[in-house]
Amino acid sequence: LFPTNGVGFGHFTRMYGLARRLRRLDPDLEIIFFTTQPTLHLPYLDGFPTYHLAGPKKFQGMDSDAWNAMVQEMLTLVLETHRPKTFVFDGAFPYRGMLDALDTIAVPQKVWLRRAMFRKGSSIPVDSIGKFDLIVHPEDAVQLPLSEVDHGVEVLTVPPMTLIDTNEMWSREAARSRLGVPQSARVTYVQLGAGQINEIDSDV
């Protein structure tokens, strides 16, 4: 499983939830994480072997070509060591180093877990999409009109993917108590989004 860095932890949360459910279905299934996320300690503590490579911005003076070469070398070693039957990537854009590693080590099933559709005019090359055998689109709470490019890869739409199941959720009272919020208070959650990525200054 390869969750990437995003603005928040959406990629990681989906993959972590997927790993927990797969383990529940088959306790003997080997599930390996390879991630650029700093949250690697969470799956590691849960018993999932985890490999980490920091994102390119963490390396001073390193260009994208050098970083992608590191991705290719490390991921190739991981794939060669574990020989997975399925590779699942969760991210907005596939890294060139990742695609090169998948070209080096054959993986029977390659899946791209991507929340958003590939909209017309997208900067994602169609040949990158074609590297995968299956595209999985988790649904959002709000349905969006489809305007997906014709990429020729099988698509599967699934319900929203969450980290925990309904029976694992805290009650309203317990959640407020853990957060230190008065039971009778009106609570508003504000998510400003992607910061510099979405230029939110103009909206605040």
Which residues make up each language-model segment?
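Structural beta-sheet core signal
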Residues: 1, 33, 111-112, 137, ...
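A conserved mid-protein helix/loop that constitutes part of the nucleotide-sugar donor-binding site
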Residues: 13, 195-204
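Short N-terminal targeting/anchoring amphipathic segment
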Residues: 75-94
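Conserved nucleotide-sugar phosphate-binding/catalytic loop shared by glycosyltransferases and other
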Residues: 1-7, 21-77
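A nucleotide-sugar donor-handling region in carbohydrate enzymes
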Residues: 115-116, 121, 128-198
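Short amphipathic alpha-helix
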Residues: 11-23
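A short helix->loop->beta-strand "cap" motif at the edges of active sites that frequently abuts
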Residues: 27-29, 105-110, 132-133, 153
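Short beta-strand elements of ligand-binding domains
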Residues: 88-90, 111-115
